């Protein structure tokens, strides 16, 4: 595992290279992440850093969290996130400190996690891209029906995981190995190549990639 940042998706735009190539990028606003706790092997059994970001109304902060934030001397945030790290990492990290966009480098590969847009109840054509039935030739009732969902008496049930109509979206998803194209330290922005999960304004988690792509 590695240390990352909590950010907020701003939207998409494009940047141009010196050669004139257009690169679609997603803009992530990563304001300084305040360190609320540092976990150690001796006390917690593993090493991790817990961060918070943004603001939260005092009425929305529970008593236990008020004490937690007060102990670290940081303002309560809208989100808490924990990043585990190895034995050789995080030596300079201390509670009440901050993590900023300079944690990353241009050209680095990152993984981005977010909550996808909720689409509500959707049929199989929209949800799983089923082909659907004939538009005519005697078909008048099942243009967008899923068709058969299983066998008869053996096994006499529908298998788990069968692709059927249901809730679409609003789930946690991670996109791996995205390239970090540009970093704007002045405005605390990360420009990442390609699309990421979620709607503009949603919280995302940016971490160094856990897998390496061999070309």
Swiss-Prot record:
Signal peptide: none annotated. Keywords: Methylation, Ribonucleoprotein, Ribosomal protein, RNA-binding, rRNA-binding. GO terms for cellular component: cytosolic large ribosomal subunit. InterPro entries: Ribosomal_uL3, Ribosomal_uL3_bac/org-type, Ribosomal_uL3_CS, Transl_B-barrel_sf. The modification N5-methylglutamine is found at residue 153. GO terms for molecular function: rRNA binding; structural constituent of ribosome. GO terms for biological process: translation. It holds the Pfam family Ribosomal_L3. Disulfide bonds: none annotated. Methylated by PrmB. Belongs to the universal ribosomal protein uL3 family. One of the primary rRNA binding proteins, it binds directly near the 3'-end of the 23S rRNA, where it nucleates assembly of the 50S subunit. Part of the 50S ribosomal subunit. Forms a cluster with proteins L14 and L19. NCBIfam families: L3_bact. This is Large ribosomal subunit protein uL3. The lineage of its organism: Bacteria, Pseudomonadati, Pseudomonadota, Gammaproteobacteria, Chromatiales.
